[in-house]
Each structure stands twice: as structure tokens, then as C-alpha cells.
Amino acid sequence: MSFVVIIPARYASTRLPGKPLVDINGKPMIVHVLERARESGAERIIVATDHEDVARAVEAAGGEVCMTRADHQSGTERLAEVVEKCAFSDDTVIVNVQGDEPMIPATIIRQVADNLAQRQVGMATLAVPIHNAEEAFNPNAVKVVLDAEGYALYFSRATIPWDRDRFAEGLETVGDNFLRHLGIYGYRAGFIRRYVNWQPSPLEHIEMLEQLRVLWYGEKIHVAVAQEVPGTGVDTPEDLERVRAEMR
């Protein structure tokens, strides 16, 4: 099954300026992400960026670049510009791999593509189990609750589901129904074209989670448990130091 990987790589970052180009053991972070994507078996890999320095780093590593506008509000909106510039057919399967995930396993990139291809659904994504209460209560860890068929009911930075009885006891661990969403998405190009024509939803603005736009407009998102747990993503200088140590 063929699929395309698009890696949004926005240069500006409040907490880590020039994030795609930060050095991780001798390579720019975006090159590490590119290498993981190559291991997935994708038919084509495109880095979507708004900065010439990022483009030069990717091209020096033999990668393909699509220059995009700097004013996109989300990664999916940046993907939509690439979809139009590359004139992908509506049924092209596209996997959105975040440009700040240098330790993402190639297996889960392929997993998202396969899951989408097997279903007539707007979007496919992944999650991993949460076992400790600290993560369950962390607003930077996005939680997701599912229906019986594995489709998302809601995504939130809040602690969902709320275990009314056990949380009152102040436990350090949580039960079996807690999942942390991973920021990797699969969609068909036609769905991306529809997504960007929808107005942002109120819930999306409150939670700052772009996937809530999909649920707001009545589309389904399939969520599978990831076959491998990805390593640390890079959002802060502290994350960067942790990743450098883990990748040595």
C-alpha cells in the first residue's frame, strides 16, 4: 500500500527558536525525522517548511522540500498547501509526521497509513496507554476516549475519563482506560481539502487541539494503540537535552 509522508517543519517556536535545525548528535533534528520516515517505506517524503535554512538542511540530506507560507495556524493547514502544490489525487493516503519527533518509530508511521487504508474514515491516529497519575493530570499530555469500535469520542488536555471514586483516593496509578494521544495523523488528500474549508470550532480554540475540528463537523477519527511507544518529542530546551542523551 503506497502512502506519502509530509513533515511540517515550522521554523519559529516560542520555547525553542529555530527548532527544526537544533543539533542532535551532529545532525539537525529535521534530518533525524526525515531518516525515520524513510524507514517507513513511504512512496514519497516531503518536508513542508517556511524557512530557507530548513530547506537547505533537508536538501543537503537528499530530501524533498515544499516551501509553504509562514502564517498557517496548524500543521494540517500547512499540509493542505502541499497537497494543492503537488496536485495529489483525493484518494492519496498522507501521513502527517511532526517535525519535532526525531525518535518516532518507523513502524507506527506505517501503522497509521495501514489503519487509514483499511477504513472509510476521515482520519486515523494513534495513542498509548497511560499508567501513572502524573501523566493523566498533565495538560501537555493530550488524552483521548474511544467508543467500542476504536473511534474517538473526544480529545482533551483535561483528565478524561474522570475516575470519580479512585481519584478521590489520591492514587499514583490509573486504570486501564486512559490513553495519551500521539501527534501523528493519516488522512486522504481529499479529506485535507475539506478540513481546511471548515471554520475552526469553539472546542478547538478552547483546547488548542486541531483534531477537535474533525469531531465538531461530525467526521470520525479512528484511534489504534501504537505498536511501539515513541521516544521523547522536542518542545522545550529540557526535552532537547533529554533526546540528545537518549539518542547517543
UniProtKB/Swiss-Prot annotation:
Function summary: Activates KDO (a required 8-carbon sugar) for incorporation into bacterial lipopolysaccharide in Gram-negative bacteria.
Organism this protein belongs to: Escherichia coli (strain K12)
Main location: cytoplasm
GO biological process terms, semicolon-separated: CMP-keto-3-deoxy-D-manno-octulosonic acid biosynthetic process; keto-3-deoxy-D-manno-octulosonic acid biosynthetic process
Any one Gene Ontology cellular component term annotated for this protein: cytosol
UniProt cross-references to NCBIfam families, sorted A to Z: kdsB, PRK05450.1-3, PRK05450.1-5, PRK13368.1
PANTHER family: 3-DEOXY-MANNO-OCTULOSONATE CYTIDYLYLTRANSFERASE, 3-DEOXY-MANNO-OCTULOSONATE CYTIDYLYLTRANSFERASE, MITOCHONDRIAL
Keywords of the record: Cytoplasm, Lipopolysaccharide biosynthesis, Magnesium, Nucleotidyltransferase, Transferase
InterPro entries from the UniProt entry: Cytidylyl_trans, KdsB, Nucleotide-diphossugar_trans
Subcellular location: Cytoplasm
Catalytic activity, reaction form: 3-deoxy-alpha-D-manno-oct-2-ulosonate + CTP = CMP-3-deoxy-beta-D-manno-octulosonate + diphosphate
Pathway linked to the protein: Nucleotide-sugar biosynthesis; CMP-3-deoxy-D-manno-octulosonate biosynthesis; CMP-3-deoxy-D-manno-octulosonate from 3-deoxy-D-manno-octulosonate and CTP: step 1/1; Bacterial outer membrane biogenesis; lipopolysaccharide biosynthesis
Gene that encodes the chain: kdsB
Protein name: 3-deoxy-manno-octulosonate cytidylyltransferase
GO terms assigned for molecular function: 3-deoxy-manno-octulosonate cytidylyltransferase activity; magnesium ion binding
Cofactor(s) the protein needs: Mg(2+)
Homology family: Belongs to the KdsB family.
Enzyme Commission (EC) number: 2.7.7.38
Enzyme class: transferase
